[in-house]
Amino acid sequence: MVDILAIGAHPDDIELSCSGTLFKQIKKGYSVGLLDLCRGELGTRGTPELRIQEANAAAEILGAGFRWNAELQDGFMNAFDRDAVCQVATFIRRAKPSVVIANAPEDRHPDHGRAADIAREACFIAGLKALDLKWEGKSLAPSRPHILLHYIQDRHLVPDIVVDISEFLDKKIEVVKAFKSQFYDPDSTEPETPISSKDFMDQLTGKAQTYGRYCGVAYGEGFILNRPAGIDNINELF
């Protein structure tokens, strides 16, 4: 159904961490779908309903084929929850991606690492023939992504690969700002958060510059591989 499925624990995780890469892949002709694991109901700013509206607006800006929500519990999702893992595996079988991009394996917010674990478990069991997963009463055929990548979030992690997003930094900032409730607003009466400061967008740009330096480009997004990557031609690396 799609070439790439991006998974985020919360609405805005995807946009903050890998939207430049998604813009780039869409321009190359690849199809992209989005899966949020929860509605962000424990978030400090905004409401779950508003965040869903913002998420849908962001998906439209990005050009995603769909945006689904698994409606897991914000703050309490974990890979030991069979139902949660099977639910995400069901979405993977529906989408049939060859590439899944998911949360950082460790980060400031505990949900991010747990979402990474859920994605890893779900990618595996989605390919098990003996596991019957249904959607709207119909069994879904097994489907296992070929590649699982983890994007990098609040905490700095050393990337295994970096994608050059120099052409798409402005689009990344635009799609991030679709989540208006979460970021700086001088008229807001809601509490401050780590991402609502006036200089946060500058910090986001600085992070992209840092990862860009790894491969000699202006701006980049870093990713961690779930397993060693195989290549056909070392001369094509840059």
Label the model's feature ranges.
Residues M1-A95, N235-L237:
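Active-site rim/loop-helix segments in enzyme catalytic domains that contact anionic ligands
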Residues M1-L5, F80-F238:
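Metal-dependent de-N-acetylase/amidase catalytic core
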